[in-house]
Every structure is written in C-alpha cells, then in structure tokens.
Amino acid sequence: MEGPEVSVIAAVADGEYQIFTPARDYKRLSDGDKGLNTGGMGAVASRSLISGELLDQIEDEVIRPSVEGLTKDNMDFRGFLYAGLMLTPDGPKLLEYNCRFGDPEAQAVLPLIKGDFAAYLMSAAKGNLMDGLIDFDNTNFSWKNFVDFI
C-alpha cells in the first residue's frame, strides 16, 4: 500500500465516542522521510490533514463499527481508540489499532483542546463523555493547527 498516514483518535465510553483532531506523526530518523522508523520524531494535528468527507468515511467505516462491535460483544471499553490509517487511492485502510492516545500525536492534539480535560477524562472513566467539558471550536475537531517536534 502507498499513501500518507493519518491517525484518528476517539475517546470512547460505554458505546459513545468523540473523535479528536486528526494527526500525523513523522517516524523516519532522517530528513526527507529517510532512515529507520522511530517511535516518532514529531507530529502535526490539523483539520486540513483530511477533508470532512474523508473523516465522515473513516467514522462510518472504522470508528463507529468498532465502537458498536465493542458494545455488541458486551465489552465495557472506556479509553482511547487510536486508528492508524493509510490514505490510499482506494480509500482509507486501517493499519493498526491501539487502545491509547498515540505519542507523539498526543503532544500535537492536546494543545488544541479547550476546557477541563481532566474532568472530561474522569467523566469518561465513569462511562459518560460529558458534552461541554471540552471544546473543539464547536466542531468535532479543531480548525487550528499544532506542530510538535521531539
């Protein structure tokens, strides 16, 4: 497969989810996307990484079915669902799942969140993604950009 990668991270609690700003990490050791893969040399989080239509497709084909599957299987999942995707000419392809906030993606996504993130996490841990505790500029992801270098 060929294409750029993107990370779509969602907070999940008892069948509910909220998608955060899409992010992309940069894994290669050297400039020009050369060298060995690392744990991440930096990341960018931006609304402009993918279109709203593509995010809707990822939600419809990956995030929502995953959360519905957890609910169907009676798995009381509360945490982050991290979908690592490759954007191919045939559409987004799931490369990996993680049940954590990606790093270094978190370092680029978290500064975009407004509000009481600690209270949001506590609420999610109790099974409720409370609207109003955090804000993404009144959309499900921010129009702002953030770059993180390690």
Identify the function of each model-found stretch.
Residues 59-81, 99-150:
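Active-site "cap" helix and flanking loop/linker of ATP-utilizing ligase/carboxylase catalytic domains
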